[in-house]
């Protein structure tokens, strides 16, 4: 079994990561941690938050390797949407489960802005576990 989690440093992203790690431990599954930074053209300097996320991914991979979890990290920057990149990684890695974090939004916010989570839920070819930020693994 292989599990994919979208990595962000937000409370929602951290909740998703906790759940993905718990699922990986429970099922002796491989874990793919993907981080994608969407930028608008022209793409100049790599945003500082992207470099910070890459450093955190490296530390996370080492930490989880030490716990006996088979971890792969994927990090990229580009103009595609986060949801499309997450779905592409899911397909490339042939994952069995995607874990994503959810944030609370107003009904109007959901209609006007769209939703990365909704796009992943509807576009995934495997089950998706959606985690709220206040849930613990």
Model-assigned labels for residue ranges:
Residues 66-98, 136-137:
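Structural beta-alpha unit
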Residues 100-119, 137:
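Glycine-rich, Arg-bearing micro-motifs that act as flexible, cationic patches
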Residues 116, 124-125:
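Short, structured coil segments at secondary-structure junctions
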Residues 47-58:
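Short, surface-exposed alpha-helical segments at coil->helix boundaries
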Residues 1-47, 65-69:
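Small/aliphatic-rich secondary-structure junction motif
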Residues 126-137:
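Short, flexible loop segments at boundaries between secondary-structure elements
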Residues 35-36, 97, 101-103, 132-133:
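Short secondary-structure boundary segments
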């Amino acid at each position: 079994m292989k599990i994919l989690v979208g990595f962000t440093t937000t409370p929602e992203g951290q909740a998703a990561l906790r759940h993905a790690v718990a699922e990986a431990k429970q099922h002796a599954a491989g874990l793919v941690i993907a981080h994608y930074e969407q930028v608008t053209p022209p793409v100049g300097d790599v945003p500082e938050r992207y470099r910070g996320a890459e450093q955190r991914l490296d530390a996370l991979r080492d930490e989880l390797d030490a716990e006996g979890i088979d971890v792969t990290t994927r990090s990229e920057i580009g103009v595609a949407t986060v949801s499309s990149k997450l779905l592409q990684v899911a397909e490339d890695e042939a994952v069995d489960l995607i874990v994503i974090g959810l944030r609370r939004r107003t009904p109007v916010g959901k209609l006007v802005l769209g939703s990365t989570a909704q796009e992943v839920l509807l576009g995934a070819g495997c089950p998706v576990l959606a985690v709220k930020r206040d849930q613990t693994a």
